[in-house]
């Protein structure tokens, strides 16, 4: 089975080139001072929901349909936060997917790039059917954006395993991307890998002490006689560059509570107030898709874990997190960015009010007082 801010900031796209200065000075702006709507505390917690969610939905771009996976990054432009979003969407061109790019001065109002889309599915490629679970890292050492994603070609029968793996794409401007020639850099069908670990999908990527660290949902191989469904725990893989990865032998975070009984579907990690925070989406169970033994994650919930060093994690006792006000929530992707004294969160979820997937905006702000 396989698993599938105070200054009005004008940011102008010109000929696909960057027209801004990046600085490294910290900034601390209360988002409620610069956004159209306020934030409301969620159930006496340290989380606050934007009152005008969702902030990003079907963009109306001619090329795109429903929003799929999302990735975020924040930099400083003239002392103020500048938000970047990358997103995959169903393509009206007939391609399985295409990649779009949008920017925002406040995290809520987004301008899509006029030259979207920038990457699309290539027929016959190993990743022709999907580009899911995207995460974007800005590598300061190399002055390079690094994107990880799950790609696959779906099986055509019960005897066809399809092709599954983790792909890498890089960009020097966040707009023009090139896929790594060694893709998939982690091949889920690699027999030597499947003896010890069975990857589910990529979760997020960081860089510490000069090494890339990828967090991957993975399980132990199923029993050869009795089979069974995988449980996608969180494992780390250290990269020797971007093409060669070595997995840890033990999980960094183990699923298995009721809200993540079957595993972790998506995650993002930030360093905040002296420790690491993982914001993740766990799920309760699997559902067969009827397509060549492929199963899909169902009954998802947003949760959180902490770690002193990013190696091993402790789940938040208040899990799951109440970061959805919808009747039938179905969170599928999450992005986290530290700006000043708070963590900004974006969650891709199903919104009953518009009957489609869209991105909601939240704050994790332990020092904020509700008026």
Where are these regions (language model features)?
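Sec-dependent signal peptide recognition
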Residues: 1-9
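C-terminal motif of bacterial Sec signal peptides marking the signal peptidase cleavage site
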Residues: 13-15
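Carbohydrate-active catalytic/glycan-binding domains of CAZyme proteins
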Residues: 22-371
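Bacterial signal peptide processing site
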Residues: 17-19
């Amino acid at each position: 089975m396989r698993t599938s801010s105070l200054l009005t900031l004008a940011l102008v796209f010109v000929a696909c080139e960057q027209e801004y200065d990046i600085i490294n000075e910290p900034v601390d702006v209360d988002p409620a001072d610069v956004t159209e709507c306020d934030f409301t505390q969620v159930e006496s917690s340290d989380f606050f929901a934007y009152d005008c969610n969702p902030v990003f939905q079907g963009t109306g771009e001619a090329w795109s349909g429903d929003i799929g996976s999302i990735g975020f990054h924040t930099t400083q432009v003239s002392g103020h936060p500048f938000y970047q979003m990358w997103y995959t969407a169903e393509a009206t061109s007939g391609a399985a997917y295409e990649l779009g790019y949008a920017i925002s001065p406040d995290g809520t109002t987004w301008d899509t790039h006029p030259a979207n889309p920038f990457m699309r599915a290539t027929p016959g490629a190993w990743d022709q059917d999907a580009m899911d679970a995207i995460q974007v890292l800005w590598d300061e050492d190399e002055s390079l954006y690094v994107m990880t994603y799950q790609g696959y070609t779906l099986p055509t029968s019960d005897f066809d395993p399809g092709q599954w793996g983790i792909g890498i794409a890089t960009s020097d401007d966040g707009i023009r991307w090139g896929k790594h020639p060694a893709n998939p850099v982690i091949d889920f069908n690699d027999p030597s890998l499947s003896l010890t670990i069975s990857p589910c999908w990529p979760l997020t990527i960081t860089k510490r002490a000069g090494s890339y660290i990828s967090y991957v949902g993975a399980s132990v191989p199923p029993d050869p006689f009795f089979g069974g469904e995988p449980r996608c725990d969180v494992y780390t893989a250290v990269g020797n560059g971007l093409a060669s990865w070595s997995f840890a032998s033990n999980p960094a975070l183990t699923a298995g509570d009721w809200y993540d009984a079957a595993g972790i579907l998506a995650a993002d990690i930030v360093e905040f107030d002296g420790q690491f925070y993982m914001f993740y989406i766990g799920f309760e169970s699997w559902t067969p898709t009827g397509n060549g033994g492929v199963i899909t994650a169902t009954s998802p919930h947003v949760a959180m874990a902490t770690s002193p060093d990013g190696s091993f994690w402790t789940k938040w006792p208040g899990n799951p997190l109440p970061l959805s006000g919808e009747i039938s929530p179905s969170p599928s992707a999450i992005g986290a960015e530290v700006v000043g004294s708070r963590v900004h969160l974006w969650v891709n979820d199903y919104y009953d009010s518009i009957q489609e997937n869209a991105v909601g905006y939240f704050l994790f702000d332990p020092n904020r007082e509700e008026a």
